[in-house]
Design a protein with these regions (language model features):
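A short, Lys/Arg-rich alpha-helix, primarily the initiator
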Residues: 1-18
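The alpha-helix within a helix-turn-helix
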Residues: 11, 22, 50
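Residues in the helix-turn-helix
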Residues: 20, 31, 59
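Recognition helix of helix-turn-helix/homeodomain-like DNA-binding domains
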Residues: 26-41
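Short, basic-rich loop-to-helix N-cap that marks the start of a DNA-contacting helix
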Residues: 38-51
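Short C-terminal boundary/hinge segments that cap the last helix of small helical domains
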Residues: 54-65
């Protein structure tokens, strides 16, 4: 199962709202909702998040058994 809990923690640590991230990387509300539900998104989106936040993928995504 994919978890984006680390992404939400990273945003909190940086005092950033989800909508700010959405606007900065240019994703749709539907994609933001998928992230919120823990649904799979395109790896390019994950890459763009990592580039924008200047962090590693381990700060964004976690695979839970």
């Amino acid at each position: 199962m994919i978890s984006y809990d680390r992404l939400w923690k990273t945003l909190i640590d940086r005092h950033m709202k989800k909508t700010e991230l959405r606007d900065r990387i240019g994703i749709s509300n539907a994609t933001l909702a998928k992230l919120g539900k823990g649904e799979p998104v395109n790896l390019k989106i994950i890459e763009n998040i990592c580039i924008d936040l200047q962090c590693g993928i381990e700060d964004v995504v976690e695979i839970k058994a």
